[in-house]
From Swiss-Prot:
InterPro entries: PAPS_reduct_dom, Rossmann-like_a/b/a_fold, SO4_adenylTrfase_ssu, Sulfate_adenylyltrnsfr_sub2. It holds the Pfam family PAPS_reduct. It catalyses: sulfate + ATP + H(+) = adenosine 5'-phosphosulfate + diphosphate. This is Sulfate adenylyltransferase subunit 2. Disulfide bonds: none annotated. PANTHER family: SULFATE ADENYLYLTRANSFERASE SUBUNIT 2 (PTHR43196:SF1). The keyword ATP-binding applies. Heterodimer composed of CysD, the smaller subunit, and CysN. The keyword Glycoprotein does not apply. Belongs to the PAPS reductase family. CysD subfamily.
Length: 302
């Protein structure tokens, strides 16, 4: 693919780097949330470009639920070590003590306690006043209307009716003590942009994004990859090897795989060109209307 056909990627890159530098200059204690997925990998790559040849002026934070894919944990530790990043890992101790898990307590309670509450705990613990996230507007309708600088009150809540105007590339980062800003440098990127940029820049990603034979079972209309032995099979369920990959990554019991033969980045890009479904179709946490993304954000979710 010729360089001249990818000029829009360079424009997106420049915008994201500008946002990252603005936050680093404006806030006293920023952090970059690192969820280990493709968007996090692109955001980290952009941050490293923004401050090259220096090191990142802020740490990475992973809010761990204890249920990520094993390959994600391996990739997280390897990446942080390779790039010399300060990596903070937080797991909600109350949730761990209660034994919260997606099979017993369901996706809504698991997400609220281990992700939303865990994130708020970590932000309070370290006193971060700005947190980068890899969310994009094309992912989901509540994210589509959220600003690049997303204001949060002292309880980390988002009010969609209380958003600040963003004229051109001017962002309002004024906050009072206890308040914070969630920052989304990839807001204007699409899933296709992400994959083209990963290919263009040769960015390392978790192998789960590439198709391979993996052990899966069908449950609730989802192809669940069995990553460890913390699952009880229901009557009639059979684990089979199938060619699958993931378009989005999260906790393995709550993230559905898609059947695919795309084993290279060009094949993924080609597959995305004809896809008619959302990348979040496999996320169980998005299926419950009562637990919609906007409601989660109002409660403090990213």
């Amino acid at each position: 693919m010729a360089q001249k056909r990818l000029t829009h990627l360079r424009q997106l890159e420049a915008e994201s780097i500008h946002i990252i530098r603005e936050v680093a200059a404006e806030f006293s204690n920023p952090v970059m949330l690192y969820s280990i997925g493709k968007d996090s990998s692109v955001m980290l790559h952009l941050a490293r470009k923004a401050f090259y040849p220096g090191t990142l002026p802020f740490p990475l934070l992973h809010v761990d639920t204890g249920w990520k894919f094993r390959e994600m944990y391996e990739f997280r530790d390897r990446t942080a070590k390779a790039y010399g990043c300060e990596l903070l890992v937080h797991k909600n101790p109350e949730g761990v003590a209660m034994g919260i898990n997606p099979f017993v307590h369901g996706s809504a309670k698991h997400t609220d306690i281990m992700k939303t509450e865990g994130l708020k705990q970590a932000l309070n613990k370290y006193g971060f006043d700005a947190a980068f996230g890899g969310a994009r507007r094309d992912e989901e309708k509540s994210r589509a209307k959220e600003r690049i600088y997303s204001f949060r009150d002292r309880f980390h809540r988002w009010d969609p009716k209380n958003q600040r105007p963003e004229l051109w590339h001017n962002y309002n980062g004024q906050i009072n003590k206890g308040e914070s800003i969630r920052v989304f440098p990839l807001s204007n990127w699409t899933e296709q942009d992400i994959w083209q940029y990963i290919w263009l820049e040769n960015i390392d990603i978790v192998p789960l994004y590439l198709a391979a034979e993996r052990p899966v079972l069908e449950r609730d209309g989802m192809l669940m990859m069995i990553d460890d032995n913390r699952i009880d099979l229901q009557p009639g369920e059979v684990i089979k090897k199938r060619m699958v990959r993931f378009r989005t990554l999260g906790c393995w019991p709550l993230t559905g795989a898609v059947e695919s033969n795309a084993q290279t980045l060009p094949e993924i890009i080609e597959e995305m060109l004809v896809s008619t479904t959302s990348e979040r179709q496999g996320r169980v946490i998005d299926r419950d209307q009562a637990g919609s993304m906007e409601l989660k954000k109002r409660q403090g979710y990213f």
